[in-house]
Amino acid sequence: MVDLTPPFRPATPDDAQALAELVDFASEGLAPYLWAKATGPGGDLWAVGRERARRETGAFSYRNAVVLEREKRVAAALIGYPLPDAPEPIPDTMPAMFVPLQELENLAPATWYVNVLAAYPGERGRGHGSALLALAERIAAEAGIRALSIIVSDSNTGASRLYERTGYREVARRRKVKEDWHNPGTEWVLLLKRA
């Protein structure tokens, strides 16, 4: 990974609560919906989120995260990693909610995938998103990856504007499968940026 200097630093397991909260913001409530399903009625969905953030492996792991600190507190985070060089087969057992997301990821092989980009509400509008996206480009370049990818909800206009302003362009869309997750969007949008 690139050398990180303040305000950036690699995430640690101690950042699990902040990472879970930021994943909630970035996913527009999808992550807590899934965590609640994993815990069952009366379970602690945030415990599931923290546990996933503390994992050593997997997409949502502190090892794939960089945090941006302000006044010694996590203000924002980036979670990202390289996508495989070839599309991954979509198994029949994959939950329907994930199929459109996997289809879009499969359209962006060999890119550096920005899985999560989020800031706490009080920290928005301060340039953290742009700074973290620039850092993502540095990380990708150091890894020899020539393009970056992001998937965003069509209803997340603020994030979409940020991505467009920083050079990302729409490539494809897939209809969301929501089950009982309440979200105003209807489609997932894949954006790419060539380095």
Residue ranges and their predicted role:
Residues 119, 125-138, 142, 161-165:
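Conserved acetyl-CoA-binding loop-helix of GNAT-fold acetyltransferases
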Residues 67, 73-82, 113, 118:
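Conserved beta-strand in the GNAT
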Residues 110-114, 124, 133, 140-151:
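Conserved GNAT acetyl-CoA-binding A-motif
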Residues 81-116, 178-179:
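Conserved acyl-donor/pantetheine-binding loop and adjacent beta-alpha core of acyl/acetyltransferases
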Residues 54-67, 83-88, 113:
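A short helix-loop-beta-strand connector motif used in the catalytic cores of GNAT acetyltransferases and
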Residues 96-99, 146-149, 153-160, 164-166, ...:
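C-terminal "cap" of GNAT-fold acetyltransferases
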Residues 1-17, 25, 32-37, 193-195:
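Conserved N-terminal entry element of GNAT/NAT acetyltransferase domains
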Residues 27-53, 63-64, 88:
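Conserved GNAT-fold acetyl-CoA-binding loop/helix
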